[in-house]
Amino acid sequence: MKYLKPFFLVTDIGFIIYWIVTFFNLIPKSWAFKDYDNSIIIAWNWSFFPLDILISITGLSSLYLYNKNREVWKTFALISLILTFCSGLQAIAFWVYSNDYDITWWIMNLYLMIYPLFFLKMFIKRDKDETSESFRGAKTI
């Protein structure tokens, strides 16, 4: 959790700030991605809102649960990491299909795709070790 906590805080609080800024139309046109005024693109962008907020809820909840020494924090963290990867992947895939290569938005979404991979590996390894251990103790028929 030592290394994961800063990523969760930056990402989860970042999402909350992004959606507040987006709701109040505070993003300058020069910073916005291509076709930001297009109603279809606006709908596409807002389609991420439930996913991004769920990422923030699960990520921040995992930090809270970790501080309360509740083992379930790992489940919340894993869900948050998977959803974060998916959020970044969806945006990158859309921009590839629409041939849009704005480096600023790509960097932010590649961050969302890449950072979870380092931590997912630790969760998967941990689960794999636990599964192997439970199979060793199982009786065969």
Residue ranges and their predicted role:
Residues 1-10:
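N-terminal membrane topogenic signal
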Residues 24-30, 89-100:
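Juxtamembrane "helix-exit" motif on the non-cytosolic side of transmembrane helices
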Residues 52, 74-93, 109-116:
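Hydrophobic alpha-helical membrane segments
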